């Protein structure tokens, strides 16, 4: 009889040391449905220890020059890059995404986050003005806020954790980070690299556990004046409630119900593969994924036929399979939630053209209990349907026709979210008109997911509060002060 497999045991990282926890929670391999890891079930006690460590580290770290801090960030990028393959393997196993995606996007982008903020941190300028008639000069300075509370999601675990840590410590803050309890492994591995990169103890503290226990303890702590959160709207509402008594600075990057608008002059050779990717990349578990596709009626039938054909070629497979385009969803509960949207659409009279309930999914025996789902295309669905108004966060997209430019803008803007949109057309004038009228924080035209990290990232309406990016992140992680000199 084969021996029982040993589970990976994670520990909190506080004050430069790994510390065990009194209790642990199970973490699952999404591709098999098996428990493979134990994550600390931290709470108030661990947050108190992390706050003490971050408080002690803050004076020395914040006193370092931007140049000195940037050297540390670049060393962090170096050690991450040296561990790229190991981190990619772990990210794929922990999250369910394909190993190819982890290798080519998640870990390289984590490296870039530190390199980018190491550079941008050196190029901020202050404002200065004179009032000669009063003999006064005014100028501004920015100072770090203090201890930054960072809460990152499960869909892009290390990618979004480092997107928060890098600008926070570059600006001179110390941090307490809480990754998702479902995808904590690469954050734990990251902690092992900090000493090698020369990060002083207490500058980066990572505490693992659930939102209701450790997340609430972090958000409500009076010595944590700033919270950066990426995740769901209900959790953001709770964070806002807990933060209000302390008047904390908040950055909330939430969900989306992102439209793609495809006009009759679109280049379908480019549009269709790009829209398949924007709909189903990372199992549709990216806040920027397309979940509503509006196609001008004159090309609707052709687009739909070709889009479904291309979707059926989008291979679902074991994450380690180099030919797989899609891996497993994050959890059994999430898989059931995504499937429930498809069932609801069917009861409303919508047609499922491919995917869930239509096509057969073939997997190796070991992976048949994993959380896999075929990419699913829905049509003949009303704009008021839950599938057209609520964030599904899975491999499900709806395709509907439209007639006029004005009509499609109104329909695209009809949901409570406003994170991202894509527009496909050869008419430059139309692109500018439509992009300006869309209620989205990001609009891609004739492309998707091309990011310039110097520019703002974030959404409108219920998609969040604030922006992230070079200057926006620097402004968020610092306090501005106006100084007046009488001469």
Curated annotation (Swiss-Prot):
Catalyzes the NAD-dependent oxidation of 2-aminomuconic semialdehyde of the kynurenine metabolic pathway in L-tryptophan degradation. The active site is at 253 (proton acceptor), 287 (nucleophile). InterPro entries: Ald_DH/histidinol_DH, Ald_DH_C, Ald_DH_CS_CYS, Ald_DH_CS_GLU, Ald_DH_N, Aldehyde_DH_dom. One of its GO terms (molecular function) is aminomuconate-semialdehyde dehydrogenase activity. One of its GO terms (cellular component) is cytoplasm. PANTHER family: 2-AMINOMUCONIC SEMIALDEHYDE DEHYDROGENASE. It is found in: Cytoplasm. CDD domains: ALDH_F8_HMSADH. This is 2-aminomuconic semialdehyde dehydrogenase. GO terms for biological process: 9-cis-retinoic acid biosynthetic process; L-kynurenine catabolic process; retinal metabolic process; retinoic acid metabolic process. Pfam families: Aldedh. NAD(+) binds at residues 231-236. PROSITE patterns: ALDEHYDE_DEHYDR_CYS, ALDEHYDE_DEHYDR_GLU. The modification Phosphoserine is found at residue 362.
């Amino acid at each position: 009889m084969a021996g029982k497999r040993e589970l990976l045991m994670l520990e909190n990282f506080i004050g430069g040391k790994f510390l065990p926890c009194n209790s642990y929670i199970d973490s699952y391999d999404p591709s098999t449905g098996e428990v493979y890891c134990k994550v600390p079930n931290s709470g108030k006690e661990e947050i108190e220890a992390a706050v003490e460590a971050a408080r002690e580290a803050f004076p020395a770290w914040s006193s370092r020059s931007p140049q000195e801090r940037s050297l540390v960030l670049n060393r962090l990028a170096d050690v991450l890059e040296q561990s790229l393959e190991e981190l990619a393997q772990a990210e794929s196993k922990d999250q369910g995404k394909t190993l190819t995606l982890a290798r080519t996007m998640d870990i390289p982008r984590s490296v870039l986050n530190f390199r980018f903020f190491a550079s941008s941190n050196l190029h901020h300028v202050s404002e200065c003005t004179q009032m000669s008639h009063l003999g006064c000069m005014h100028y501004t300075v920015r100072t770090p806020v203090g201890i930054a509370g960072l809460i990152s999601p499960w869909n892009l675990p290390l990618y979004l954790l480092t997107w928060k840590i890098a600008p926070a410590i570059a600006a001179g803050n110390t941090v307490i980070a809480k990754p998702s309890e479902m995808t904590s492994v690469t954050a734990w591995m990251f902690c092992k690299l900090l000493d090698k990169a020369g990060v002083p103890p207490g500058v980066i503290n990572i505490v693992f556990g659930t939102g209701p226990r450790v997340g609430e303890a972090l958000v409500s702590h009076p010595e944590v004046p700033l919270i950066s959160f990426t995740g769901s709207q209900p959790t953001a509402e709770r964070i806002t409630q807990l933060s209000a008594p302390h008047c904390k600075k908040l950055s909330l990057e939430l969900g989306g119900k992102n439209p793609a608008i495809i006009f009759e002059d679109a280049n379908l050779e480019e549009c269709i593969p790009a829209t398949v990717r924007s709909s189903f990349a990372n199992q549709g578990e990216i806040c920027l994924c397309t979940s509503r596709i509006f196609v001008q009626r004159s090309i609707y039938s052709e687009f739909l036929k070709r889009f479904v054909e291309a979707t059926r070629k989008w291979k679902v497979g074991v994450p380690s399979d180099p030919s797989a385009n899609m891996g497993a969803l994050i959890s059994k509960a999430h898989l059931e939630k995504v499937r429930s949207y498809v069932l609801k659409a069917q009861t409303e009279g919508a047609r499922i053209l491919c995917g869930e309930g239509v096509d057969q999914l073939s997997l190796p025996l070991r992976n048949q209990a994993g959380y896999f789902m075929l990419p699913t295309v829905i049509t003949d669905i009303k704009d008021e349907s839950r599938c057209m108004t609520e964030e599904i966060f899975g491999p499900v997209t709806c395709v509907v026709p439209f007639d006029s430019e004005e009509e499609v803008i109104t329909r695209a803007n009809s949901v409570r979210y406003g994170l991202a949109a894509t527009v496909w057309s050869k008419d430059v004038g139309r692109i500018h008109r439509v992009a300006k009228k869309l209620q989205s924080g990001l609009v891609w035209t004739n492309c998707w997911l091309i990011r310039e990290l110097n520019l703002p990232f974030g959404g409108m309406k219920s998609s969040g509060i604030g922006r992230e990016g070079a200057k926006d992140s620097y402004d968020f992680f610092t306090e501005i002060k106006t100084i007046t000199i009488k001469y």
